[in-house]
């Protein structure tokens, strides 16, 4: 079994370059299915297990896909099938984003109910509501969602919650629909804007991405194009916190301040120095951190994908902090693992009461989801002694070479196979 071992106490310094955004690249890869002409070329693609998974889904659907270095090419000009099987979709909830493109391109879609991180209920109802509004017949049978439509027709769709996945799926389906589709109360994340830009480069007519209302005028066909994926704001935020908690001085290259303004505001409240530079964001950690309360919200609010990492810096701050989760239920499973490291945390409903500053102690802990994996490694950076983090399958879904990037900044961190390493003598690793 692989694990990451961290010896706490090192200050991080230097620079680290961000990769393409996981949450942007997956829907963009799915959107290549809409192109009936040409070959799509996607650049700045991160080397993540989720990317390999969605590439496999597209291959199964009869697209020709290659992934070399940071570039994915997709030729979807052949006869695309419409059945995305459980063996792939179970690995990753985001696989459902192929449903909109399949429905638009082939008139039908059969996609297994999704899997992925176990962080509460993320119902697909909003996706299906949009498809039905455009004229699709939808049914759920034997663990599969089946949708068919002789033709999709533009419609007005109101989302009860600004779901990122539903916004993306309905937006993609609407690109080839007859007439105009208006989606209200949509997600406004930067990843939505990136997808809209890609669709428009293909010949779609998408207006309003980044606002609360998106308008799509359907076209007859889309043509493949070249596109570079935006930098990953969650990876950037994770490294910003790593720099802050270690009292370091780190330049986060390619980070876009406008994409993480809520995180920047909270870190500055805590006493962290944030400097916007020409090629990124510099973070300088303070001697003492001030306690702040945080509530996750849809963008432009504080991102739920930064919740567990933010809790690490909250538990190191002086005083009492509160973290409130409003986007997903059951996203506090990492709290028990952090308590093993001597964090003083108490769950009360949708909030966690955090008393600090904690004197963290190294322990063996298990990641419970993707962002929790990163958070536990961050905690290890400032814990006394050695922290061993297992269940790295979660980490690999969203971070490429996380330990290597931390090493380059000066952290004592190693990724090891414990069947080949004497974990009873951890000092020998460093």
UniProtKB/Swiss-Prot annotation:
Q: Which residues form a coiled coil?
A: none
Residue positions annotated to bind phosphoenolpyruvate are 22-23
Q: Which CDD domains match?
A: UdpNAET
Q: In which pathway does it act?
A: Cell wall biogenesis; peptidoglycan biosynthesis
Q: Which reaction does it catalyse?
A: phosphoenolpyruvate + UDP-N-acetyl-alpha-D-glucosamine = UDP-N-acetyl-3-O-(1-carboxyvinyl)-alpha-D-glucosamine + phosphate
Q: List the Pfam families hit by this protein, alphabetically.
A: EPSP_synthase
Positions where 2-(S-cysteinyl)pyruvic acid O-phosphothioketal occurs in the chain: 117
Quote the cellular component terms of the Gene Ontology held in the record. cytoplasm
Per its database record, what is this protein's job? Cell wall formation. Adds enolpyruvyl to UDP-N-acetylglucosamine.
Record-given protein name: UDP-N-acetylglucosamine 1-carboxyvinyltransferase 1
């Amino acid at each position: 079994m692989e694990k990451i071992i961290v010896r706490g106490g090192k200050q991080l310094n230097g620079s680290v370059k961000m990769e393409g955004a996981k949450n942007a690249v997956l829907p963009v890869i799915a959107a290549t299915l809409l192109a009936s002409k040409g070959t799509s070329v996607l650049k700045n693609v991160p080397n993540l297990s989720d990317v390999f998974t969605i590439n496999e889904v597209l291959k199964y659907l009869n697209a020709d896909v290659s992934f070399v270095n940071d570039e994915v090419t997709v030729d979807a000009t052949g006869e695309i099938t419409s059945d995305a099987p459980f063996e792939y979709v179970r690995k990753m909830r985001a696989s459902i984003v192929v449903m909109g493109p399949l429905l638009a391109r082939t008139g039908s879609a059969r996609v297994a109910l999704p899997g992925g991180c176990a962080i509460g209920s993320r119902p697909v109802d909003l996706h299906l509501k949009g498809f039905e509004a455009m004229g699709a017949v939808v049914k759920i049978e034997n663990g599969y969602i089946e949708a068919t439509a002789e033709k999709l027709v533009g419609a007005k769709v109101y989302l009860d919650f600004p779901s990122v996945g539903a916004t993306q799926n309905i937006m993609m389906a609407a690109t080839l629909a007859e007439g105009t589709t208006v989606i209200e109360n949509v997600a406004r994340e930067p990843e939505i804007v990136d997808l809209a830009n890609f669709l428009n480069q293909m010949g779609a007519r998408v207006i309003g991405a980044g606002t609360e209302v998106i308008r799509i005028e359907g076209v007859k066909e889309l043509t493949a194009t070249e596109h570079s994926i935006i930098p990953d704001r969650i990876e950037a935020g994770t490294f910003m916190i790593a720099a802050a908690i270690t009292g370091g001085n780190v330049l986060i290259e390619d980070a876009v301040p406008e994409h993480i303004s809520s995180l920047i505001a909270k870190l500055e409240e805590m006493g962290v120095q944030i400097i916007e530079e020409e090629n990124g964001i510099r973070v300088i950690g303070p001697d003492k951190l001030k306690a702040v309360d945080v509530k996750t919200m849809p963008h432009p609010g504080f991102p739920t994908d930064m919740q567990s990492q933010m809790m690490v810096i909250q538990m190191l701050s002086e005083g009492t902090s509160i973290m409130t989760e409003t986007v997903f239920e059951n996203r506090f499973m990492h709290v028990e693992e952090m308590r093993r490291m001597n964090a003083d945390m108490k769950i009360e409903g949708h909030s966690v009461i955090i008393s600090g500053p904690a004197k963290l102690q190294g322990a063996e802990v298990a990641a419970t989801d993707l962002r929790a994996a990163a958070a536990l490694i961050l905690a290890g950076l400032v814990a006394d002694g050695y922290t061993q983090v297992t269940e790295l399958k979660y980490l690999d879904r969203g971070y490429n070479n996380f330990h290597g990037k931390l090493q380059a900044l000066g952290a004592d961190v190693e990724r090891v196979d414990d069947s080949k390493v004497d974990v009873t003598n951890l000092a020998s690793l460093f």
